């Protein structure tokens, strides 16, 4: 590759004097960004790596805390490939809370999958950080127990595993110790070997220690000449007030562009396909409004309980854990107007418009439940309060159903029903779109009195057995006139034999690239909490007793009354 030079113009004398007199920087250095765009080696589109060539300066925030100035330049502006010399940068990924279940079951396997697919830079390292005392080898043994060759069952990937594990290291330290993060910084620098260093921190830890870790990492272990980004796991607070305080504290050390708030449901294949289905198919786009859609249902169910994690779950409950984030994010994607472009900010701005068009959830539009012990098939299933980590008289809901409305021209009057619960009869997540009845309905008699059987329904199954199917009415072959419902379906496992990437793979890759489309912006988070906080406070202040439902059932009866209040029948009732 030919060598290209870049000329940085000198500032004018007037601007120079201003910088000297009033600049908050400890030293004034020219800064410029460079980026590389090249085709990915896998099913993903492109990998973009952004670097910064000069040493960073320190910028004091309003509270006097230093912020990594180089990473503030992480704007995504790109130059051409010719300005980048191959191999001049390195990527350091630090998983904070590396000994936890999320890291073992999701994050490390996702990083290995990206490595296997050739989506990580040539020069990268992975560090685990936690309080647990481990050696490098012990971390590698822990990681290797969770890695599989699921990406391509025909190929043994033992060699790839070994190569990946050699890039994995461990550092033990306290989450609030600047000294321990300074030691981590030394180890990162050893692996980076003087190259331009880009650093990604994944906070797989409880939210009450987010700020301590961000403070220590920002002050002691930020990149000095590249970008620094931080992935933050939900929950993002418990209500509007705590969420706002968490954001304010994080922004003492990070800019909004450095914070990647992850909701792994946004990385799921069918959720990402939602906008493609709508905006690239003329058959659906004209129907996507109150004129043709009768109701929309967002359903989430798990066929297991808290399984010993009740102590953690009891602090939040099902509304905060699932409804306020996963289901509301899907709702916003489903209902948003056509964005100006596929740029992250354009998409996120349209989602915010949807959330701001909604009225806060009313207590009369919420049903809460809690699973109780149940004997089935000779087996005893424990109730929620039977979990030893849960208080005996806990009122925390493990099930919730809610009706919400969007007050705009497209969706006025259309009920958006949400349902989420633990210890139900099945595991799944899906979006159900029930269309209006055909005007006149010539074949009404063929369906007797149950007009719900005549309703067209679009179902997008997020998990398991990902698929899309459209329920239509057709004539049963024969001499008589008998109608039946049939499914036009796209089952992913039948149509696409290739393994579907895990949501964490896509989201980690996007964070490395600086692609923010599937991450949550602070104003989006604020708008989401504003919708749920009033009802959550009422539930807790009035000590609303949840309706009990047996472990393994379809949930409390109250959910059906809520649906019928808006002339809706839950679409999943007819399925096993």
Swiss-Prot record:
EC id: 1.1.1.49
Catalytic activity: D-glucose 6-phosphate + NADP(+) = 6-phospho-D-glucono-1,5-lactone + NADPH + H(+)
Keyword Zinc belongs to the record: no
Coiled coil residues, start to end: none
Tissue specificity: Expressed in leaves, stems, buds, flowers and siliques.
GO cellular component: a single term: peroxisome
Keywords attached to this entry: Carbohydrate metabolism, Chloroplast, Disulfide bond, Glucose metabolism, NADP, Oxidoreductase, Peroxisome, Plastid, Transit peptide
Subunit (UniProt): Forms homodimer. Interacts with G6PD2, G6PD3 and G6PD4.
KW Plastid (keyword) present: yes
Residue intervals passing through the bilayer: none
InterPro entries on file: G6P_DH, G6P_DH_AS, G6P_DH_C, G6P_DH_NAD-bd, NAD(P)-bd_dom_sf
Source species: Arabidopsis thaliana
UniProt similarity note: Belongs to the glucose-6-phosphate dehydrogenase family.
Regulation: Regulated by metabolites. Post-translationally inactivated by cysteine-mediated redox modification via the ferredoxin-thioredoxin system in the light and this avoids futile cycles with photosynthetic CO2 fixation.
Pathway where it operates: Carbohydrate degradation; pentose phosphate pathway; D-ribulose 5-phosphate from D-glucose 6-phosphate (oxidative stage): step 1/3
Listed NCBIfam families: zwf
Residues of the transit peptide: 1-50
GO MF assignments: glucose-6-phosphate dehydrogenase activity; NADP binding
Protein name: Glucose-6-phosphate 1-dehydrogenase 1, chloroplastic
GO process annotations (BP): glucose metabolic process; pentose-phosphate shunt, oxidative branch
Disulfide bonds, paired cysteine numbers: 149-157
Function noted in UniProt: Catalyzes the rate-limiting step of the oxidative pentose-phosphate pathway, which represents a route for the dissimilation of carbohydrates besides glycolysis. The main function of this enzyme is to provide reducing power (NADPH) and pentose phosphates for fatty acid and nucleic acid synthesis which are involved in membrane synthesis and cell division.
Active site per database record: 326 (proton acceptor)
Encoding gene per record: G6PD1
Xref: SUPFAM superfamilies: Glyceraldehyde-3-phosphate dehydrogenase-like, C-terminal domain, NAD(P)-binding Rossmann-fold domains
């Amino acid at each position: 590759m030919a060598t290209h030079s870049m000329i940085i113009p000198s500032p004018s004398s007037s601007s120079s004097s201003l910088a000297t007199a009033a600049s908050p920087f400890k030293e004034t250095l020219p800064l410029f960004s460079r980026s590389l765009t090249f085709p990915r080696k896998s099913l993903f589109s492109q990998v973009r790596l952004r670097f910064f060539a000069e040493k960073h300066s320190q910028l004091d925030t309003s509270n006097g805390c230093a912020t990594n100035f180089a990473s503030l330049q992480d704007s995504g502006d790109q130059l051409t490939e010719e300005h980048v010399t191959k191999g001049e940068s390195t990527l350091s990924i630090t998983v904070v809370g590396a000994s936890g279940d999320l890291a073992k079951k999701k994050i490390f396997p996702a990083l290995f999958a990206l490595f296997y697919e050739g989506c990580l830079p040539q020069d990268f390292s992975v560090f685990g950080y936690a309080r647990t005392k481990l050696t490098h080898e012990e971390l590698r043994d822990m990681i290797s127990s969770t890695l599989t060759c699921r990406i391509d069952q025909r190929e043994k990937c033992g060699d790839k595993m070994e190569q990946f594990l050699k890039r994995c290291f461990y550092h033990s330290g306290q989450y609030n110790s600047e000294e321990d993060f300074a030691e981590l910084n030394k180890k990162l620098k050893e692996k980076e070997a003087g190259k331009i260093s880009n650093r990604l921190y994944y906070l797989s830890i409880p939210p009450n220690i987010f700020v301590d870790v961000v403070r220590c990492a920002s002050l002691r272990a930020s990149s000095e000449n590249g970008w620094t980004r931080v992935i933050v796991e939900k929950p993002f607070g418990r209500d509007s007030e705590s969420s706002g305080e968490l954001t304010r504290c994080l922004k003492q050390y990070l800019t909004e562009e450095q914070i990647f708030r992850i909701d792994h449901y946004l990385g799921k294949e069918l959720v990402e396909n939602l906008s493609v289905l709508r905006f690239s198919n003329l058959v659906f786009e004209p129907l996507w409004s109150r004129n043709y859609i009768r109701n929309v249902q967002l359903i989430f169910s798990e066929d297991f309980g808290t399984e010993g994690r009740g102590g953690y779950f009891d602090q939040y409950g099902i509304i905060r854990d699932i409804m306020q984030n996963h289901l509301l994010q899907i709702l916003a994607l489903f209902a948003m107007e056509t964005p100006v472009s596929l740029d992250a900010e354009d998409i996120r701005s349209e989602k915010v418009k949807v959330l701001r068009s909604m009225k806060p959830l009313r207590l009369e539009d919420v049903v809460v439940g809690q699973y109780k012990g149940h004997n089935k098939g000779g087996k005893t299933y424990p109730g929620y309060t039977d979990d030893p980590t849960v208080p005996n008289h806990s009122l925390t809901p493990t099930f919730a159903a809610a009706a919400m409305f969007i007050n705009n021209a497209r969706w006025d009057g259309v009920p958006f029903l949400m349902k989420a619960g633990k210890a139900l009869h099945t595991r799944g997540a899906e979006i159900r779109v029930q269309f209006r009845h055909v005007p006149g309905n010539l074949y009404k008699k063929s369906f007797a009195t149950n007009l719900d059987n005549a309703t067209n329904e679009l179902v997008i199954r997020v998990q398991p057995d990902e698929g899309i199917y459209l329920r239509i009415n057709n004539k049963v072959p024969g001499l008589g006139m008998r109608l039946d419902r049939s499914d036009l379906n796209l089952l992913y496992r039948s149509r696409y034999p290739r393994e579907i990437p895990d949501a964490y793979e896509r989201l980690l890759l996007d964070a490395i690239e600086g692609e923010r489309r599937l991450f949550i912006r602070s104003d989006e988070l604020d708008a989401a909490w504003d919708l749920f906080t009033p009802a959550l406070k009422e539930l807790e202040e009035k000590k609303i007793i949840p309706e009990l439902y047996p472990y393994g059932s379809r949930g409390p009866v109250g959910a059906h009354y809520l649906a019928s209040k808006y002339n809706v029948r839950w679409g999943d009732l007819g399925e096993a």
